Amino acid sequence: MAPSASAATNGYDVDRLLAGYRTARAQETLFDLRDGPGAGYDEFVDDDGNVRPTWTELADAVAERGKAGLDRLRSVVHSLIDHDGITYTAIDAHRDALTGDHDLEPGPWRLDPLPLVISAADWEVLEAGLVQRSRLLDAILADLYGPRSMLTEGVLPPEMLFAHPGYVRAANGIQMPGRHQLFMHACDLSRLPDGTFQVNADWTQAPSGSGYAMADRRVVAHAVPDLYEELAPRPTTPFAQALRLALIDAAPDVAQDPVVVVLSPGIYSETAFDQAYLATLLGFPLVESADLVVRDGKLWMRSLGTLKRVDVVLRRVDAHYADPLDLRADSRLGVVGLVEAQHRGTVTVVNTLGSGILENPGLLRFLPQLSERLLDESPLLHTAPVYWGGIASERSHLLANVSSLLIKSTVSGETLVGPTLSSAQLADLAVRIEAMPWQWVGQELPQFSSAPTNHAGVLSSAGVGMRLFTVAQRSGYAPMIGGLGYVLAPGPAAYTLKTVAAKDIWVRPTERAHAEVITVPVLAPPAKTGAGTWAVSSPRVLSDLFWMGRYGERAENMARLLIVTRERYHVFRHQQDTDESECVPVLMAALGKITGYDTATGAGSAYDRADMIAVAPSTLWSLTVDPDRPGSLVQSVEGLALAAQAVRDQLSNDTWMVLANVERAVEHKSDPPQSLAEADAVLASAQAETLAGMLTLSGVAGESMVHDVGWTMMDIGKRIERGLWLTALLQATLSTVRHPAAEQAIIEATLVACESSVIYRRRTVGKFSVAAVTELMLFDAQNPRSLVYQLERLRADLKDLPGSSGSSRPERMVDEMNTRLRRSHPEELEEVSADGLRAELAELLAGIHASLRDVADVLTATQLALPGGMQPLWGPDQRRVMPA
């Protein structure tokens, strides 16, 4: 194979590439597989060390890029993941979903830039076997919750099945509309040393990963557009379209215009992004239990002042948590009465409750017999041999070989890797198996192939597997062409399918072409048309959008005030004997008032002025990047990101690109640099990037979001927060009379912080007075930064809410604030009392500030009220209204 000219120029050709890859594979430099699944089949090169034809173009592309190019590729993929907000929360698989550690934060999704390439011939084998397996599991599910002939005929042992947590007694008698009971199926597979494929696990409870698979395709296709165009892998998007049609078709027969929702456990779910991204692709609302209610045997979604009927639920909540009435009583993730609604046939839940029984590891032992009995077919895809402890001969084999098997409990889900257990652990396990043999199975250790990975700019070898997906259609099962590939963890952890990174799976087309038209497979049209995507206005969603508006505005205002304070500090830190320098402690005190955290006391005296200027650098640092500092900039950004994650399906992709840049700018940093110049550079960058990001986000919201009730509630949050911030800032800076030079400096800084200095100078020709400032910042309805403007927008937004009467309590409260404001006059507000205070100004600002807080509280207690027992996703402490 001759290297390309560009590869030769780069000094990195295919021969060198292969030599490095062979060395890495032989020495196992990336993953130590000597105690793990072994090298086995190599996807990339054949037994003679030559690149397989399926991978030729990729080998050329990697060789052409060289080490520097591979490094850049990793960086590009990381940036794309960051920009798209693709996350994953790594949690203990046995974590209680009800009492999980909410301190766990989602981390960035790890994706290997190099795809796993599958030939057209291999895909034909996989597709046929996968579809057959879905058909078989569907037949088993229908039998187990129907006639149970496989039990009565002795093919399946009841003691193994009914003790499995996936069996749901309350699901007996539930029948999905149509011919299929298993709606969606995911299957983990690997390749054996002889090149054939083997199934390692089936996922039927609430299969995850299809959203990640399609997100991975988007990222990798953008990262290597030239290679994507050259290889022209078959697209994954038809699967999303097929899934959408299938969900609509799954509605009860009486539903003429079906409404479909995706039920999620919430943002703390391990695969929250997967759920939200899939909901976005499908065009269906992402909901949580708080959004739904069962009334009169029907499922409804809470909307502002009304209820909307729901016909189909794509369930991503495990079955036992789906209904606290009929299933797990302490669940906060389910909907009371959902099981009863299913029994009545008023709603379809997919995958159906009870489908998790198909994940029983003991079932693998009987699949060959079941395939012959139910399908009259031999399995096309096999699993590693399984031995069930309930059969004497197999129990003997299991006990004799426990140190070399994968041991699984059919009751607890516990999985033990025999080769990793000590003698004492093996002896204890043998006793447990002898005591209750029917609940244990032993499986031969799975084997995996290896494939190229991009590790630190070097082409390395690692064990790989893949998860493939199907969805039920009236005509059969439709697979995703491709799926979710993954790089296995080093050593024995691979046997339990522990992964360290994902891989996009590229299926080569049957006939090479530079482009392939993306179309939905030819399917029978759905029986129902399906409702269009309607605005989601449940209290939970509206609450999160309300707080998005508040946190976004809070971050913008905080960034601007921090910039002004930092700049004034550098101007006056060597001029502390001037009257103008008093603006620094005043601004510092304003920061303290706004954040509810005192920066100092007694600002204004010469001693205090010097003292506050001295501590300004450390205070500005903590107020910018310290996540534990109340009211800090990073805390506002984190609150914004958390609220956005909860309503991901409501937001555009551009939102995540902006948020990613802002989060990086203010991410947690260590102690400030010793050098003041270095610290200032860090702060300047963080504050400026946050301000730019918030302005961009405001533009995205204004120009890209539909101005529905959700947008209205977000704007309400924005207007309340801007009003709170403005009244707190003006009260902290203008209510006390100071030396004229100091007052001018303070007014200038305040106007800059309010983004109104340019218009002020143009109107007043540079003359500074408190009356002129209040005229502009309180009474000018044409100034989008003024208080009256916020009140007018707030009043209009409240009027636009569904069910508005024009005289609701929040509307009356805003009218009262407007009346009070319009009765005041700038000249009167400038008047000074005997104690040197502008008492009327201070009283007005304090009163409106308190009233705005009251409006927020009333909205939270009424339109945004969550059902009884529910808690805000970030807890009460962080949801307090600020400024104080």
UniProtKB/Swiss-Prot annotation:
It comes from the Bacteria. SUPFAM superfamilies: Glutathione synthetase ATP-binding domain-like. It holds the Pfam family CP_ATPgrasp_1. InterPro entries: ATP-dep_Glu-Cys_Ligase-2, CP_ATPgrasp, DUF403. One of its GO terms (cellular component) is plasma membrane. This is Uncharacterized protein Rv2567.
